[in-house]
């Protein structure tokens, strides 16, 4: 009886580990397929930098600090630029 229980638990543990590893591999392969080329990422970075610095300059003319929430998607406004958090 103990041997059967140990065998069942071992099999269940192996199944869980195998499933987790398979999900990780699938997620990695999807990330690699969906990723943007470096040139497109650079264009997005430049656009965010421009938007943030322009909005910060407008805010500063009114003697206000740069709005931190102006940059989105893991970016924040710092020194009149959008920087990756």
UniProtKB/Swiss-Prot annotation:
The entry's function note states:
Postsynaptic neurotoxin.
| Tissues where this protein is expressed | Expressed by the venom gland.
Q: Which SUPFAM superfamilies match?
A: omega toxin-like (SSF57059)
Q: Which family does it belong to?
A: Belongs to the neurotoxin 12 (Hwtx-2) family. 02 (Hwtx-2) subfamily.
Q: What is this protein called?
A: U4-theraphotoxin-Hhn1c
Main subcellular localisation = secreted
From what superkingdom does this record's organism come?
Answer: Eukaryota
User: What S-S linkages are listed for this chain?
Assistant: 52-66, 56-77, 71-82
Q: Where in the cell is it found?
A: Secreted
